[in-house]
């Protein structure tokens, strides 16, 4: 039993282990398959990676993707007007397409750093072609200075990392940019573009040296623009970059459908052998706009551009021969009435039973206009057979021959003749068309190589084959410079070709492009019709003047030759009407009967042609000009010449046709010419009679046979009747009557009557004399004005001279003031020297007084010494000097203060006591001191000191008086009064200073009141020194 249980356990464990191994193997296989899928997505090479490397690469990729997403969110448009399901790039592309604009970034030196792809549809340039150009290369030359001024005075510049852009940083300007494209248009083809953007500092752009700029490094142009060469001093910030959008103000509707998703730019369709739609792919509606049920059963040719039909037909012929192929670039009309460029790869699918062609499978691919431009440039470089013919700068003929592997096509482009004059120059047209004939002879051997409008008689050719015509008017030729004062002429193109190639224009829209073969005529404006009518009137006037001149010359002949003259006039008239190259507007032409005969042999008129005629060429459309229909001879009621080869002049009998067939239009035209001929004949006869009368009168007046005309009076009714009668007789004569209704005769110096010519000469002489008098008076007036201006200039110079003299006087006064200041400084120095001498004397006096004070040692007055000085006379003299000047001069006041401050130091109490005693004895000898002075020597010493003191004070007073006199003299010289001389506040201050101090003690001596008052008033005249 134990063995059986062990066996059961083993089998269970085995089964569990086996199932576990299977599940692990399944998990490993699934993990390996996932790792292989990741390696196929991550790895960029065919080398096999291990599992760990695949996982590491996946983690790194996810990190980078998340970081890029976070970075893009910073610059993502967060406004509400942007749909959430559109990315930033898609929304920007759609905005540019809807605004008909493009983005451009260029530096201050003009180098273009970036241009969006939408510039190709707007101006016809590829973005990579613009990177080697500058904005000055595209801009109109007259706008270069405005562009330079914009960069020299920029608006507030945005920093490199600044994201908040306000309207204050925005700048708007207009300029004209040259158009590009497949065809080399004129140099004047410019479009007005509005730029809106801002300036930004580019940290990557360095200023660089001149050598770097010349080498084209650091984003600078290799060659400086012409505006910088003309203005070498112009300084612009080379780190400045303009970022903005440009919008063409008059869009030329150059569009191709922009496909955002690159995977949805092709679709598939099936066509029958008659090229009708049998099937349309589900990818087609987003591209062409049509649903499958809308196009099934319709022909593909209904959606192709008219200019591309010939190349498409040639490609389909090649498809029928080879069974497969690739079409050229062609335009397809979408449901939104836009033209998109397509290229198709197709092959023929055969029936499985009878092996006959069943249908054609086409794979259509949308191509951009840039690719079309590249392909056209490559073909142009390969062919190299384009030639341009220019005559006098007024007409331009472009003959180009393009060869390809699919179909050989020869295309000749004829620009309209732009004639500066109103009349058509036949020689210019003949030369241009002669060159055209030689150019097309190589590609079309069946066409006669003689010029279409040849003025020489050429032998008729055996055969004449005229190729069909095609005309188109591209939208790019609407106007070269729009919205400006420059509006060049519009161009029209006429094509001559045998097999039409891919010569379509890239600038067509459904609204202005030709969509059917019947609309082949070019547009003739009313202005051109007016020019042709003016041309006819001009020739009629010329014919009238010529006949008039001839008749004047023939009046001297005899009357016998009148019939012969009339015959000659008729011949001249016929020659003029036949030989004049006039374009006659066409009236509605009815059906005509065709004569049997050769294709290019036209019956001639019944009379010989005086000169070879010029007939409008056959490439011009029938609705515009009266011409012969190619390949179908028609008899005209007036003399014409064959279009390609006029026949030589033959006899009248040989050129008479058997039958003449005329349309109603031709018969009507013949009637008009006959009536005009009759009117001209009558007019010629009338003029002959008038000229004969005038010549007779002139002859009589020359020999004074004609008497002066008498005065005649006319009534108003008679005057009008006579005037009307004369006008009816002559048609061009006018009558002028004076106010008195009389003709006033005039006579010359010999007494002969003056005729009208002499009277006119006299009037002209009088007019000349009046003009000379007027010129003389004007000259005198000009001389007077010049004299007045000369006198005004003299007065002005005198005033300037007076001003200069006044300035010189002011300078002299300033110099005098400086000299006076120097003198005052010298006086101050002298006073300081005198004060020093006085101080030395005071020191000697003080030494003697100290001896006396030491002996006495008395101090009755304590407060009096602070206000008194040793020299009362000096103080009183200073006070008098100050009161005399009265503050008239601040410098003098300062000198007085300096004098007061330079007094000797104050004495002590003993000195003051001695001074009081001296003053008391001087004032009154009756003062009794209760002290005895026993020393006799002291009295004698005091007397000596007094004598010295009085002599020093006298010297000081004399010096002060001299100073006062000098100051008075200076005041008289300056002649100016000072405000401070009459200032009462300064005097009041001095008076306040003269008052007694309040801290004086009562003297303990016996003296009278008057003596005490004199005692205390005399030493305090100048207390300012103690303050």
UniProtKB/Swiss-Prot annotation:
Lineage: Eukaryota, Metazoa, Ecdysozoa, Arthropoda, Hexapoda
One Gene Ontology cellular component annotation held by this UniProt entry: nucleus
A single MF term (Gene Ontology): protein heterodimerization activity
UniProt name for this protein: Circadian locomoter output cycles protein kaput
Subunit structure: Efficient DNA binding requires dimerization with another bHLH protein. Forms a heterodimer with Cycle.
Organism: Drosophila melanogaster
Annotated gene: Clk
Bias (Low complexity): 383-402, 504-516, 552-575, 871-909, 951-995
Function: Circadian regulator that acts as a transcription factor and generates a rhythmic output with a period of about 24 hours. Oscillates in antiphase to the cycling observed for period (PER) and timeless (TIM). According to PubMed:9742131, reaches peak abundance within several hours of the dark-light transition at ZT0 (zeitgeber 0), whereas PubMed:9616122 describes bimodal oscillating expression with maximum at ZT5 and ZT23. Clock-cycle heterodimers activate cycling transcription of PER and TIM by binding to the E-box (5'-CACGTG-3') present in their promoters.
One record GO biological process: behavioral response to cocaine
Record's compositionally biased regions (Polar residues): 443-486, 1006-1027
SUPFAM superfamilies: HLH, helix-loop-helix DNA-binding domain, PYP-like sensor domain (PAS domain)
């Amino acid at each position: 039993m134990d063995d059986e249980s062990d066996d059961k356990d083993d089998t269970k464990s085995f089964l569990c282990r086996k199932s576990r191994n299977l599940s692990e193997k399944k998990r490993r296989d699934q993990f390996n398959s996932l790792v292989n899928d990741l390696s196929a997505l991550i790895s960029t090479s065919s080398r096999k990676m291990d599992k760990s490397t695949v996982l590491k690469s996946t983690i790194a990729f996810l990190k980078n993707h998340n970081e890029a997403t976070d970075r893009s969110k910073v610059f993502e448009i967060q406004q509400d007007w942007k749909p959430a399901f559109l990315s930033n790039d898609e929304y920007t592309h759609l905005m540019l397409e809807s605004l008909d604009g493009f983005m451009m970034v260029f530096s201050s030196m003009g180098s273009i750093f970036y241009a969006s792809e939408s510039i190709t549809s707007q101006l016809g340039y590829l973005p990579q072609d613009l990177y080697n150009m500058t904005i000055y290369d595209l801009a109109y030359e007259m706008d270069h200075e405005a562009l330079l001024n914009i960069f020299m005075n920029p608006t507030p510049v945005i920093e490199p990392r600044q994201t908040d852009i306000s309207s204050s940083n925005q700048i708007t300007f207009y300029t004209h940019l040259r158009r590009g494209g497949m065809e080399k248009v004129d140099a004047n083809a410019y479009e007005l573009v509005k730029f809106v953007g801002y300036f930004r500092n580019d940290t990557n752009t360095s200023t660089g040296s001149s050598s770097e700029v010349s080498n084209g490094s650091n984003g600078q142009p290799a060659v400086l623009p012409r505006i910088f060469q003309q203005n070498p001093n112009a300084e612009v910030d080379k780190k400045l970059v303009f970022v903005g959008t440009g919008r063409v103000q008059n869009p030329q509707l150059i569009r191709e459908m922009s496909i955002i998703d690159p995977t949805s730019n092709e679709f598939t369709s099936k066509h029958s052998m008659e090229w009708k739609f049998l099937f349309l792919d589900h990818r087609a509606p987003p591209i062409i706009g049509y649903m499958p049920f809308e196009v099934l059963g319709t022909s593909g040719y209904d959606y192709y551009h008219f200019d591309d039909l010939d190349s498409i037909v040639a490609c389909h012929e090649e498809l029928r021969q080879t069974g497969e192929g690739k079409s050229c670039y062609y335009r397809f009309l979408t449901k939104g009435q836009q033209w998109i460029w397509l290229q198709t790869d197709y092959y023929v699918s055969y029936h499985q039973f009878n092996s006959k062609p069943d249908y054609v499978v086409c794979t259509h691919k949308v191509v951009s206009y840039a690719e079309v431009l590249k392909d056209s440039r490559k073909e142009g470089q390969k062919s190299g057979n384009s030639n341009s013919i220019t005559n006098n700068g007024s007409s331009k003929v472009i003959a180009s021959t393009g060869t390809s592997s699919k179909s050989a096509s020869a295309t000749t482009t004829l620009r309209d003749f732009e004639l500066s004059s109103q009349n058509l120059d036949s020689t210019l047209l003949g030369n241009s068309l002669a060159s055209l004939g030689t150019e097309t002879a190589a590609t079309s051997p069946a066409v006669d190589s003689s010029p279409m409008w040849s003025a020489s008689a050429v032998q008729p050719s055996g055969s004449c084959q005229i190729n069909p015509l095609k005309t188109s008017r591209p939208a790019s030729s609407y106007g070269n410079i729009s919205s400006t004062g420059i509006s060049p002429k519009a161009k029209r193109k006429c094509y001559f070709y045998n097999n039409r190639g891919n010569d379509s224009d890239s600038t067509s829209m459904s609204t202005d492009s030709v969509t059917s073969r019947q609309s082949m005529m070019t547009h003739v404006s009313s202005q051109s019709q007016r020019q042709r009518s003016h041309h006819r009137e001009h020739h009629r006037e010329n014919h009238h003047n010529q006949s008039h001149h001839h008749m004047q010359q023939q009046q001297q002949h005899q009357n016998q030759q009148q019939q012969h003259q009339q015959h000659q006039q008729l011949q001249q008239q016929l020659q003029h009407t036949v030989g004049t190259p006039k374009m006659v507007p066409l009236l509605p032409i009815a059906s005509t009967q065709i004569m049997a005969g050769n294709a290019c042999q036209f019956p001639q008129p019944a009379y010989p042609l005086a000169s070879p005629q010029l007939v409008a060429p056959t490439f011009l459309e029938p609705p515009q000009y009266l011409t012969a229909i190619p390949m179908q001879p028609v008899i005209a009621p007036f003399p014409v010449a064959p279009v390609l080869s006029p026949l030589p002049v033959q006899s009248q009998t040989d050129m008479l046709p058997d039958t003449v067939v005329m349309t109603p239009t031709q018969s009507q035209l013949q009637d008009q010419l006959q009536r005009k001929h009759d009117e001209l004949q009558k007019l010629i006869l009338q003029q002959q009679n008038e000229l004969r009368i005038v010549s007779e009168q002139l002859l009589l007046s020359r020999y004074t046979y004609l008497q002066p005309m008498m005065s005649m009076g006319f009534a108003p009714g008679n005057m009008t009747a006579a005037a009307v009668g004369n006008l009816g007789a002559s048609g061009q004569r006018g009558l002028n009557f004076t106010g008195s209704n009389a003709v006033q005769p005039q006579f010359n110096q010999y007494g002969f009557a003056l005729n009208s010519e002499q009277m006119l000469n006299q009037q002209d002489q009088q007019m000349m004399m009046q003009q000379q008098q007027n010129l003389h008076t004007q000259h005198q007036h000009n001389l007077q004005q010049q004299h007045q201006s000369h006198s005004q200039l003299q007065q002005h110079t005198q005033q300037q001279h007076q001003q200069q003299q006044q300035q010189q006087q002011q300078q002299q006064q300033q110099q005098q003031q400086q000299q006076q200041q120097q003198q005052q400084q010298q006086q101050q120095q002298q006073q300081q020297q005198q004060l020093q001498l006085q101080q030395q004397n005071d020191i000697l006096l003080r030494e003697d007084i100290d001896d006396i004070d030491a002996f006495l040692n008395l101090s009755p007055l304590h407060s009096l010494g602070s206000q008194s000085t040793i020299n009362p006379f000096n103080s009183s003299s200073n006070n008098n000097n100050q009161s005399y000047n009265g503050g008239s001069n601040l410098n003098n006041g300062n000198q007085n203060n300096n004098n007061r401050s330079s007094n000797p130091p104050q004495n002590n109490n003993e000195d003051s006591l001695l001074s009081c005693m001296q003053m008391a004895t001087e004032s009154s000898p009756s003062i009794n001191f209760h002290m005895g002075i026993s020393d006799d020597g002291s009295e004698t010493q005091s007397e000596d000191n007094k004598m010295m003191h009085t002599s020093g004070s006298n010297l000081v007073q004399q010096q002060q008086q001299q100073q006062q006199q000098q100051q008075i003299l200076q005041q008289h010289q300056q002649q100016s009064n000072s405000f401070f001389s009459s200032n009462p506040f300064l005097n009041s201050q001095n008076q306040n200073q003269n008052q007694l101090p309040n801290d004086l003690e009562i003297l303990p001596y016996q003296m009278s009141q008057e003596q005490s008052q004199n005692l205390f008033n005399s030493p305090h005249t100048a207390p300012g020194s103690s303050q």
